[in-house]
């Protein structure tokens, strides 16, 4: 073990072993020290001494920054014994340091000490810790928002002469897919499915806007086409960028006449109407809800439903699910499942999507089934 020696001796040893230019070391903003094989500090630069408020030369390396026993993982010992450059992080007097230990050799090439450079990374670590805490809070808030989004989904229930069932699976914590079923008046029941561009918080907030606005409009307007035109008018007042848009398919079922009127605002996942004998798609044109247009008028069609008729609503997370080769699931696959499985359609489609898909789920998806039961 080396005894504490004066600075002149240290300078002499530095020059003797050709370690590093002394004046360069003394002028560095980082802490620099040289530790021998016994763990004794044989050199410390001015910055380190001034920061610690003492001359640490001659001290055991761990004692120089307040420890009572050697570190469980000693990078100095590792560096000297293996000749490797080793790095770890230390907390000294409340500050964080990235410490890098490099082997030092003499003129014969033998490792006899390690030079350690302490770089103060306190600011970076505090920012990281703050970011971690903020992320924790954000995750907690997102979890709360997710529960709210799930709770406002309609019940899987019977509404007079129709029954509603669905499967809802967001790709992230929050979804851009939304659907709803509600009474309009004593005769009419409204049902829609929508798909907001993007994912996450912004998309989820848009689904809230759609839900609240649709439930507000229904008190004054029954017609699906007029409802979508009014929805677009209110959407345009938000003054959003053109990359913020959504699609929506909206239908109104009259429980007395069994007439189903519907309109489409760019929802390219055309609902499928089927029963034991036939299957057809409810195709109708219509632009999505986007501020690319000053005004949009929507078409309206109607069909007559009967007991046993079913309408399957879905979003593009179904048809655009891709396998390993990039092949999409497609509407054809959905229709084949309907043809071969008259019962438990939602579960069959969901199971097939899981089997078909490769990797993580890339998009939200929703499946909603409306069935005329009497």
Task: Identify the residue ranges that each predicted region occupies.
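Conserved hydrophobic beta-strand signature of PAS-family and PAS-like sensory domains
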Residues: 41-42, 262
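Conserved acidic
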Residues: 3, 120, 195, 316, ...
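… and, occasionally, acidic/histidine-rich disordered N-termini of signaling adaptors
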Residues: 130-312, 359-374
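Sensory coupling linkers of modular signal transduction proteins
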Residues: 2-11, 105-135, 319
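Terminal output helix/cap of sensory domains in signal transduction proteins
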Residues: 59, 63-93, 349-355
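Active-site-proximal, acidic helix/loop segment immediately C-terminal to a metal-coordinating Asp/Glu
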Residues: 202-220, 305, 309-358
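Sensory modules in modular signal-transduction proteins
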Residues: 11-38, 46
């Amino acid at each position: 073990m080396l005894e504490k020696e004066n600075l002149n001796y240290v300078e002499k040893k530095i020059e003797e072993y050709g370690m590093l230019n002394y004046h360069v070391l003394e002028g560095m903003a980082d802490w620099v020290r040289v530790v021998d094989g016994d763990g004794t500090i044989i050199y410390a630069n001015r910055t380190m001494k001034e920061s610690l408020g003492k001359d640490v030369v001659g001290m055991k390396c761990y004692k120089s920054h307040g420890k009572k026993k050697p570190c469980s993982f000693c990078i100095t010992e590792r560096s000297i014994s293996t000749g490797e450059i080793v790095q770890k992080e230390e907390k000294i007097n409340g500050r964080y340091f990235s410490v890098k230990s490099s082997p030092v050799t003499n003129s014969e090439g033998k490792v006899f000490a390690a030079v350690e450079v302490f770089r103060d990374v306190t600011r970076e670590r505090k920012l990281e810790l703050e970011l971690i805490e903020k992320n924790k809070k954000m995750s907690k808030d997102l979890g709360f928002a997710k529960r709210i989004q799930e709770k406002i989904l309609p019940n899987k229930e019977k509404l007079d002469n129709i029954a509603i069932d669905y499967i809802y699976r967001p790709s992230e914590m929050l979804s851009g897919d939304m659907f709803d079923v509600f009474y309009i008046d004593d005769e009419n029941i409204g049902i829609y499915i929508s798909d907001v561009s993007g994912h996450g918080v912004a998309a989820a907030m848009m689904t809230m806007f759609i839900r609240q606005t649709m439930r507000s409009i229904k008190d004054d307007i029954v017609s699906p086409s007029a409802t979508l035109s009014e929805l677009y008018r209110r959407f345009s007042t938000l003054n959003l960028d053109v990359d913020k848009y959504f699609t929506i398919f909206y239908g109104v079922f009259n429980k007395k006449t069994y007439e189903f009127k519907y309109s489409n605002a760019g929802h390219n996942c055309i609902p499928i109407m089927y029963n034991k004998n036939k299957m057809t798609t409810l195709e109708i044109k219509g632009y999505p809800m986007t501020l690319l247009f000053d005004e949009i008028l929507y078409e309206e069609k109607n069909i007559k439903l009967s007991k046993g008729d079913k309408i399957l609503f879905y979003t593009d997370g179904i048809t655009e699910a891709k396998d390993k080769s990039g092949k999409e699931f497609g509407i054809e696959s959905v229709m084949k499942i309907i043809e071969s499985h008259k019962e438990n359609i939602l579960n069959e489609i969901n199971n097939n999507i899981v089997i078909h898909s490769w990797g993580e789920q890339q998009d939200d998806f929703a499946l909603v089934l409306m069935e005329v039961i009497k």
